Amino acid sequence: MIIYFRGDSVSRFINHIGSFFPKLQKDFKIYTGDIFPDVYVGDFYDKIPYEKYINYNLSFNLDNATYVKDFGVIPDNSCVNNAICINNAITKCNETGGGVVVVSGGNYTCGTVYLKSNVILYIDKDSSIVASHNTNDFTDNALIYAENCENIGITGPGKICGEGNYFSLKPYCPPKLEPFSETLDVWSLRQEYRKRIRFPHKTKYGYLMLLKNCNNLKLYNLILENSAMWTVNINSCNSVDISNVAINNNRHVANSDGIDICGSSNVVIKDCFISTADDGIALKNNMSVSTSGDDGLKIKNNLDVTCRKGMSNIYIHDCEVISCTNAFKIGTETSLDISDVTVENCKFYLTDIYPAGVSGISIESCDGAKVNNINISNIEMNSMACPLFIRLCNRNGDNKPELEGRGEITNISVNNIKADNIEIPIMIMGIPNHKIHDVNLKNFDLRYAEGKDYYDFRFKIPEQEKEYPECNRFRNINAYGVFVRHAENISLENIKIKPRKNTFRKYKKIIDCKNLSIK
């Protein structure tokens, strides 16, 4: 039996009969086609306050610097691969004790550029490194690559451009620039976004930047644009400082995460602006080869981005994130432990295209990781559908017997959250016999988007224990405020939520929760 409180057409009934049969629901996806380089209005965010984040007049000591123009580079010619020339300049700088390699005087098309120890890559104002459109020019699945290096840096105020449009398929629909005329159910909102995704073409080269097993790494005063996949992949590194970086991606290119910290510790991300299609800032820690997420393309050479140890001491503050999916996320790849994470004084939003972003804050352990001591505070959101999604499941994406049922989420503190135009309640979801522990939420001020409430009644919300974890996969939840299932020691204090005026849903729905405190 399905009871609808709005909508009486047969087509609406048929579209939502999947409430009882979730396996019948399939995500929209385009698998084949030609490269589609055209840019629609709404693909890029056109109001990035670069002057707030980028210092175009930053003084830099260029005494004894190495200039790429002395190594035969040819600017402003998209048919020329300048990677060999730039790599020769970097090698020369490294072999003479290190220093600064200067990219100036134009835009340089490149395949993979390799950083080396004790070298800072400086991209001057009005200059850039631009990804070649020939996938054969990339030898390590990234435009900028470093491995086993120390004391390296990349700075601007110039740009690194990934040319993501040239490695993607045509979307089914162009960006939606106006709100929907009526309230859609959560699953339909998910599909409306997916119809606008530029899914990967088989030629996709990989990351804009992959920095692997490096120590003492700095990215600062730099503009990154139009990544074809993850923009910054910091993998198995230690002592990382990312500051005053502006990321401006096409907001419909699949898997174009902003900053992904994978298996790395002692990381600071501050004063950054990120506008992207996929996760804004993500923390991941997995054992095996990455497949680049739910819609990922296994990139050539089966690139190993394996993380081999627990990660800790991550501090993120004073950042702005525009994301069509998750603004801040722990997950999904989570087979090894993540702990001691602080996120504060950030803004998460998506206010100029529709539908809303998936979630503002997402904390997940789905492959066996112990996620512990996560502290998030002073966050403002607008048009992020779910303000907070905490999910413990048992996907075990690495297929390791020792990880089966090992995962934990404990000691989570989220305070002082203000969010407008939400669509989904706070969700805290473990699985049977495997609970989330010790979650403290305090001082939330949440307001639903305008419109009539959409509501479908189901006797049972599926566990989806082995599925990809995302809040909108559970469709409409029968509570507007808080949904808690399989949890213990949960504290909710001063959680204010303004629902839609006509809602039939109750404030909370609690299933299998021990020691719940509401003040």
Give short role names for the model-derived ranges.
Residues 2-28, 40-120, 124-213, 218-220, ...:
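Extracellular "leader-to-stem" segments immediately downstream of a signal peptide or signal-anchor
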Residues 98, 109-112, 132-134, 140, ...:
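Short glycine/acidic-rich loop motifs that flank beta-strands on beta-rich extracellular proteins
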Residues 388-389, 403-415, 464-476:
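Generic long, charged, amphipathic alpha-helical segments
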